[in-house]
Amino acid sequence: METNCRKLVSACVQLGVQPAAVECLFSKDSEIKKVEFTDSPKSRKESASSKLFPRQHPGANEKDKGQQGKNEDVGAEDPSKKKRQRRQRTHFTSQQLQELEATFQRNRYPDMSTREEIAVWTNLTEARVRVWFKNRRAKWRKRERNQQAELCKNGFGPQFNGLMQPYDDMYPGYSYNNWAAKGLTSASLSTKSFPFFNSMNVNPLSSQSMFSPPNSISSMSMSSSMVPSAVTGVPGSSLNSLNNLNNLSSPSLNSAVPTPACPYAPPTPPYVYRDTCNSSLASLRLKAKQHSSFGYASVQNPASNLSACQYAVDRPV
């Protein structure tokens, strides 16, 4: 059968006839077992299918599968090649770290030549030294930021919390630009709450005692009341003027200026006003002695009933 098919195929080729199975005969001559040269529908379908899906050698399929497997292996290896290999960590010795830290304390931004010198001293590469300085600067900046944050957080004590409150929280009873309508009286101020003074246990009005002068004039009045008993020859107009000054000043000062003790310090020592008062009394006594020595103690001044201002105006120039 196979010999007959081969003879028929050779004859058809010589005559120029190309049957439907010629391609199969030329491609795989030894494997053809049955050849149909009829024009039956079955043969036509088989010829069409053979053109669309030509037969392949089973060894070729195995070769193709092997090539596909190799391509897959190459594709699997490509991402690993593209993936950046992890660099090994550099383990510094204590001597190297000591040298690097000493240089960092002197210069935080060394140039290329300095880095090369450090690399020679520490037996490292310039790239390793550059990376170490970069990481060390980042650590230093982070520590500086943390220290500044701690200072800002703990810089103000609790006694200053009252000063940090808003205006509305400190003075809830007062509206904007309404001071004239309510009036700034001592009663209105005493009823308001001041967080800063409350935290320090201080009355707001008691702060006036820290800035108000002492009752030097009242002490002057007490000392001046003793002058007539000691001085006899002094003109009466000056004594009357002192008494008038005491009568005018002492009630107003005693009613206006409170005298609570300062909570921060012991009672203050006498002011200079008392010293001047004592010096004036000493001068008055000295003048009295001079008048008594010259015999003017019995002389009466005709203008003794005048006030201090009238006496100053009527004096002859």
Swiss-Prot record:
Q: Where is this motif: OAR?
A: 279-292
DNA-binding region in chain numbering: 85-144
Please give one Gene Ontology molecular function term for this protein.
RNA polymerase II-specific DNA-binding transcription factor binding
- Ranges for region Disordered: 35-99
Residues modified as Phosphothreonine? T90
Q: Motif Nuclear localization signal: residue span?
A: 285-289
GO terms (BP aspect):
anatomical structure morphogenesis; animal organ morphogenesis; atrial cardiac muscle tissue morphogenesis; atrioventricular valve development; branching involved in blood vessel morphogenesis; cardiac muscle cell differentiation; cardiac muscle tissue development; cardiac neural crest cell migration involved in outflow tract morphogenesis
UniProt cross-references to InterPro entries, sorted A to Z: HD, Homeobox_CS, Homeobox_Pitx/unc30, Homeodomain-like_sf, OAR_dom
Kindly list the GO CC terms recorded for this protein. Answer: cytoplasm; nucleoplasm; nucleus; transcription regulator complex
Q: In which tissues is it expressed?
A: Expressed in pituitary gland, brain, heart, kidney, eye, lung, testis, tongue, spinal cord and skeletal muscle.
Bias kind Basic and acidic residues: ranges:
35-48, 60-73
Q: Which family does this protein fall into?
A: Belongs to the paired homeobox family. Bicoid subfamily.
By what name is this protein known?
Pituitary homeobox 2
Q: What is the lineage of its organism?
A: Eukaryota, Metazoa, Chordata, Craniata, Vertebrata
